[in-house]
Amino acid sequence: MSGRGKGGKGLGKGGAKRHRKILRDNIQGITKPAIRRLARRGGVKRISGLIYEETRSVLKVFLENVIRDAVTYTEHAKRKTVTSLDVVYALKRQGRTLYGFGG
């Protein structure tokens, strides 16, 4: 093996990167009806118009924190793939234990 570390499948010299879609305002993908459905599931009857943007910003911060912790677990284990257990442990670390996905 030529010093490529674990699972050295690296053939060639890297080459050109494929086209990648530029990620910009993906938080708008959480649509107004989707937020309404989540609120309905939580027992909400009427929703103020200002709620939607606020919900998106709170959700974005929450996901950033969970993903940051999950990626930290992944990097510590010297992996490149985030597993469901990484997410479970990240949620547990934040005091939001999730059952049903192992661990």
Curated annotation (Swiss-Prot):
It comes from Mortierella alpina (Oleaginous fungus). One of its GO terms (cellular component) is nucleosome. PROSITE patterns: HISTONE_H4 (PS00047). Residues 17-21 bind DNA. Glutarylation at Lys-92 (H4K91glu) destabilizes nucleosomes by promoting dissociation of the H2A-H2B dimers from nucleosomes. The modification N6-methyllysine is found at K6, K9, K13. It comes from the Eukaryota. CDD domains: HFD_H4 (cd22912). The modification N6-acetyl-N6-methyllysine is found at K6, K13. Belongs to the histone H4 family. The modification N6-glutaryllysine is found at K92. Core component of nucleosome. Nucleosomes wrap and compact DNA into chromatin, limiting DNA accessibility to the cellular machineries which require DNA as a template. Histones thereby play a central role in transcription regulation, DNA repair, DNA replication and chromosomal stability. DNA accessibility is regulated via a complex set of post-translational modifications of histones, also called histone code, and nucleosome remodeling. The nucleosome is a histone octamer containing two molecules each of H2A, H2B, H3 and H4 assembled in one H3-H4 heterotetramer and two H2A-H2B heterodimers. The octamer wraps approximately 147 bp of DNA. SMART domains: H4. Pfam families: CENP-T_C (PF15511). This is Histone H4. GO terms for molecular function: DNA binding; protein heterodimerization activity; structural constituent of chromatin. It is found in: Nucleus; Chromosome. Signal peptide: none annotated. Keywords: Acetylation, Chromosome, DNA-binding, Methylation, Nucleosome core, Nucleus.
